[in-house]
């Protein structure tokens, strides 16, 4: 029987109190400017070229050799395997109920779901609800910082970039890679396989970009909006949405005047 170490009690209590206090901080407002746009566009072009040359063809090949059921089973496995990331961040966000529910989901799918390949937990009213360290930092009140595009990673921000090392420390895929040193970096193959499954799931949404004038702006704004909804559990306040969309300080009267002038010009007969 493991002996109880009473000397750690005060420190553990203090740590828990600090975490709950931090989690109660006001979320910093979203940022709408893009001070590093020149650099970001270069990185976006690099990532787009890498995607077209290697990543997308690999995802397409993966879809060709797997059935929808097989892909769903594989996605279930990776989602369950990475559940420790969500559970720990639930605790850091002072959400013990979410942590308990996601722990139950992890246990059910790891056992009844044969290692996570199947998802009986969803049928038991324990749906997948993921979170990460970037959301944790946001709920602690850390400002978003400038938008950033990272090579081979894509859209992120100065705040969200810290989720990569933090979440990797909680990710069994990261544990596997860090504990091995195989030839040709083969220890990273499971992580690469996970990324391929994510890219394959995005193939169906590619038609959304067909009519997009500036894909860089589309990805940037879509990323910021998605993160905002994740931070607020799908219900961001109207003020945060207005700031994100740049409509918080709009002069409605000025916009109406501009619209009126535009309509007048269109109504004037053309002069030859």
Where are the regions a protein language model picked out?
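Bacterial N-terminal signal peptides that target proteins for export
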Residues: 2-15
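Post-signal peptide N-terminal segment of mature Sec-exported envelope proteins
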Residues: 31-64, 79
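Mid-length scaffold segments of soluble, non-membrane domains
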Residues: 80-159
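C-terminal motif of bacterial Sec signal peptides marking the signal peptidase cleavage site
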Residues: 22-24
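Beta-rich strand-turn-strand
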Residues: 75-77
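A structured, mid-to-C-terminal "fold-capping" secondary-structure block
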Residues: 26, 141-272
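Residue-level signal for mature regions of secreted extracellular proteins and peptides
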Residues: 18-19
